[in-house]
Amino acid sequence: MLQVQEKAGSVFFSIKAQPRSSKSMITGEYDGSIKVNLKAPPVDGEANLECCRLLARTLGVARSSVEIVSGTRGKMKRVKVFGLSAVEFTEKITPYLYSSP
């Protein structure tokens, strides 16, 4: 089950990123985290930027509302999205976690 924490008007959750994929997309859930394939390589923060763009587009929030708070140099990342409650976040992300690509 996806682990989401709500604090001070923001939600926090984990991402497992797979850079250099053929397509940028949310592919499901992995051990309480959101599994994300990213087309960008893990060079000069390109994959992190692509991850934030993908999440902002998927959740319908501004790119500036999405921030990687830890794990910028690894596959496992902790992400903060400002302006969503845990309920809103779960409603928006669930269709992407449990649908076929």
From Swiss-Prot:
InterPro entries in alphabetical order: DUF167, YggU-like_sf
Segments passing through the bilayer: none
Gene Ontology, cellular component aspect: cytoplasm
Gene3D superfamilies, sorted: YggU-like (3.30.1200.10)
Disulfide bridge partners, by residue number: none
Family: Belongs to the UPF0235 family.
Protein name (record): UPF0235 protein Cphamn1_2066
Organism, scientific name: Chlorobium phaeobacteroides (strain BS1)
